[in-house]
Amino acid sequence: MNSKVFAALLLLALSTCVLSEKYCPTPRNTSCKKMNIRNNCCRDSDCTSNAFCCAEPCGNFCHKASDKPGGRRVDPNASCQTGYVYW
């Protein structure tokens, strides 16, 4: 295979991967009272319809993926339990 064709195909494949990356949406709330913190998920596999488990000030919630960065996915290795979080 011609090296120029190979390089072009490789560049196309890499750009497709980068452009198709999905993120958690920006959280709506920027603060939360401690008594209202609830985790609906602890990892992406807790969510349905290929949603992401996203960390927010009031806990972890499942959200549809966004094309724009702004939110933060939950670390699947972090200690987490679903339900209300009591301090």
From Swiss-Prot:
Signal sequence residues: 1-20
InterPro entries in the record: Elafin-like_sf (IPR036645)
Tissue specificity field: Expressed by the venom gland.
The keyword Coiled coil is annotated on this UniProt entry: no
Keyword Protein transport on entry: no
GO annotations of cellular component type: extracellular region
Disulphide bridges: C24-C54, C32-C58, C41-C53, C42-C80, C47-C62
Function per UniProt: Has antibacterial activity.
Protein name according to UniProt: U14-lycotoxin-Ls1a
Organism: Lycosa singoriensis
